């Protein structure tokens, strides 16, 4: 299919669920859009209005949501100990049973996509080889399945292209 992505990792239309396929989606509140600008409901309204989407909430959401891990320039360096923030957040998303984590922030898309294996992300893929700091989110998630990370705007575009 035609690639609708840019370098921010917004996604592509390949593998998009066809009309009628049920999709469980959880929304990740980005720090700047959410906590800084207090925009919480419009992205949820948009995602929830897409056909066949069931919107589910993570335990920490809206003003209590956790960062994706990119804040404070963390996107550009490897964690040297403990669990990567993005790994912890993607496991929280997986706990909802969601097929997709939707976000409206390119940094969050990259960080969470890296943790879920759905994009290259900002950090190297072999962070675990550099001191064992990278907890494998797949083994920590329920059933070992991680949700795909998608940009809200791309999800809307896909629905428009399907004529929904």
Language-model features and meaning:
Residues 1-164:
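Iron-sulfur cluster-binding electron-transfer modules in prokaryotic oxidoreductases
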């Amino acid at each position: 299919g035609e690639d609708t992505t840019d370098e921010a990792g917004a996604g592509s239309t390949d593998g998009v669920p066809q009309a009628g396929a049920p999709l469980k989606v959880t929304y990740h509140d980005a720090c700047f859009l959410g906590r800084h600008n207090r925009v919480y409901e419009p992205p949820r309204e948009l995602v929830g209005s897409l056909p066949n989407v069931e919107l589910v909430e993570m335990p920490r959401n809206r003003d209590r949501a956790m960062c994706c891990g990119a804040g404070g320039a963390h996107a550009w360096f490897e964690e040297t100990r403990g669990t990567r923030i993005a790994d912890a957040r993607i496991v929280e998303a997986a706990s909802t049973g969601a097929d997709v984590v939707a976000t409206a922030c390119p940094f969050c898309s990259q960080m969470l996509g890296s943790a879920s294996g759905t994009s290259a992300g900002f950090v190297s893929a072999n962070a675990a080889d550099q001191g064992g700091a990278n907890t494998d989110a797949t083994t920590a998630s329920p059933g070992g399945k991680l949700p795909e990370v998608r940009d809200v705007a791309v999800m809307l575009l896909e629905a428009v292209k399907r004529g929904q």
